[in-house]
Amino acid sequence: MPKPRLLAEVLVTVLLALWAQAAAAQTKIVVGYTATADFASGFIALDHGLFKRRGLDVEFKLVPLNSQLPAAVQSGSITFGGTTVSVLLQAVDGGLEHVAIAGSGVTWPGQDSFGAVMRADVAYAKPKDFIGKKVGAPGIGAFLHVLFRNWLLDNGVDYKKVTFVEVGFPQMADVLKGGNVDAVVTGEPVMGRIVAGGIGRQVTSFTDNLKSELPIIVYSGTRKWAEANPAAVKAFQDAIAEAAAIANKDQAAVRAAVANYIKMPPEVIAAMKLGRWQAAVTEAGIAGWVDIMQRQDMLRTGIDAKTIIAR
């Protein structure tokens, strides 16, 4: 290959890379999140400058309930919502053109970083003891609510005989202590605080019945935004991937990052059970949620997993 042509191709490659970074730098990204450690990889990406290094100006904004995130994305008050997959699928099923940008927390067999916590003075011996109880969930139709109902079904319990009410993570300890609910489905670090305070006890992590790993949180945005900002999407995905690798091997980094975005006593952060993180959103993971939700009659339309993942 002639040398001038080689130099020209190198120059074009460099210029394209610089242009992509510059384009991304012009884009402000506001991410809505809820008070759970499943967002640790995103927190790490922000605190370690992984977004900034790629020319992104990212801000994380606390939202009380996960079920509120699609509306916030649609209104433009946030760019991405850290939606649970079940919330994203319901939004798409309802007609919103939203797509998954990147992943965050994932489930795995034997996981205990989230679960159902029964109030200390309420008896519990078996899954059917939830019948007639009032259970607080951080978003009706969100991850914990849907996965817990799936566990009830697999244990022969009609979830329609359980009353569910929405309770934000920050209010769970007080609502449970006050006797307003019998149990909550929750995650770390809130779960650890409730248990450590003697307010309740974890009775199940409701993952022993799962056949495969499932994504918990996906950063989702409008299809229109993703298609108009491919450089920013790629930069965001790369930053989350680097942060997930850090989160999966550095517990101290996870605890420090969670402490910065979820205000809890230091002893709660130090003792919280940690999860796992995965940046890639897979068709198999989305399809697994479609199956679980169809079993609960939560979807009106057929959803093709590959159509809601930003490429």
Where are the language model's segments positioned?
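Short, solvent-exposed loop/beta-turn-alpha elements that line the ligand-binding surface or hinge
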Residues: 53, 108-109, 208-211, 276-285, ...
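Secondary-structure end/capping motifs
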Residues: 226-298
